[in-house]
Amino acid sequence: MSEPIYDARTLWELLERRVANSPDRAFLIDDADRTVTFGEAKNQAERMAAGFAALGVGEGTPVTWVLPTRIDTVVTSLALSRLGAVQNPIIHIYRDREVGFCIRQTAAELVLTPGEWSGFDYQAMVERVVADLDEPPAVVDASAGLPEGDPAALPPVPTVPADGQDAIRWIYYTSGTTSDPKGVLHTDASLMAGGVGLARALDMQPTDVGSIAFPYAHIGGPDYLVCLLANGFPAVLVEKFDLMAAIESFNRHGVTMAGGSTVFYTMFLGVQRQQPDDPIIPTLRLLSGGGAPKPPEVFFEVQAEMGIPVAHGYGMTESPMICQGSPTDTDDQLAHTEGHPVFAAAVTICRPDGSECDRDEEGEVRISGPQLFSGYRDPTLNDEAFDEAGRFRSGDLAVMRGDGHVTLTGRVKDIIIRKGENIAAKEIEDVLYAHPKVGAVAVIGLPDPGRGERVCAVVETAEGAEPLTYDEMVAVCTDAALMRQKVPEQLVVHDGPLPRNATMKILKYELKDALVDVPWSDV
């Protein structure tokens, strides 16, 4: 087995070096069991790059793509990397308003769509939003085939500048828990630093088999791609997530690492409970993911019933990896923290004045390091985003323990102020999640004339369970020794699943908007 490749400067260099080491090893496996090797993927990417070049794509050309998690999508991203294009991947849940905003702000010259996919016509949507532009981009329907050409006609591979100032190669938009997306600028180097951090923390090996069951257009997609290329192992791609179909596919291909977010853990756990003596995926060595903090109870349930650890991580669009749990961590570390800062990432917990907190003192997470983004597409947002020391203000609250592991405690803006008392929503959510009737929960603050804000718990009922009652909610909070002021005054049992974005993060602002004007009385 070859050594991992952790020092490449560009994504294309990483692919070339992987192909030189192991061209015939499996790389990508799709839902239909089609397998592409590293060498085959490079050859396909070069042909596709030649086709894009014939359309006028070159170094620095902005290209927007909204494509499903497919082999061809991964190859497309590699082909555009070969040319040095500036890629703007868009998650498939975006619609006219968001897609139009991204195309305009990035000044895209080419847009790639899947045509009609999953019951929605993406080609028609893009054609609508570009129709009124002064200089509309070319729009290509990938369902009719992507362009190809002769690799011999390709221009030279773009080089890294001698001054080491890496060029912007990616523009991602924030995942949509706020109303206005922000364009986040990344270089190949910053994305690869995140992927290397993840690979090191999870001790990824050439013998592993990974999985991408989340949208590849999410920043976690290319980050995971880096893991595959750096360590030389394959991944199973899931285009449309169906739980039982995914489990069958993972079993066929011997997947060793799976996950995506807390909701994936609980879905796998639900199937495992139906066959407690028979592992649903015997080859799994761990579940891993991120997107939102996991309740400690999830770790202990998965460990007890599936016999494997949950190694959860912490990242965001601006810094794809910040902290990551490791299979070598203790149970306490895995259950109660988001892991240790990843390789080369600098994480500081700060007071409002910017001074560093003591260990176990709550403060804001501020970040620096090679995995950090280069700023926003709208530069007017940068002054507020970075502090005087150049650290990114994450907006997340956390404590760094004595062992260097980080526990998220909430959001700076997710603090509920009830009668002058600061209440962290996450603390209450972790308590309520432990109740068997709770499938998912969001704790929000709603305007209240007597309290300033009142604490409202919005609960998604666990599959097969009866709805949680108010008295049961109070009892579980009391049993957990929550102070009385933190016990929610209001319980809303949500009709159906809680609203989520493409990475399964609960959209609290939608819940607040839906409930803010609903009459309520505690009398």
Region spans (language model):
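Conserved ATP/PPi-binding loop(s) of AMP-dependent carboxylate-activating enzymes
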Residues: H340-A344, S355-A385, I423
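Conserved pre-ATP/AMP-binding loop-to-beta segment of ANL
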Residues: A8, P23-A26, D141, P151-Y173, ...
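Gly/Ser/Thr-rich phosphate-binding loop
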Residues: A230, R252-G260, L269-Q333, A346, ...
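AMP-binding/adenylate-forming catalytic domain of the ANL superfamily
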Residues: L482-T503, D522
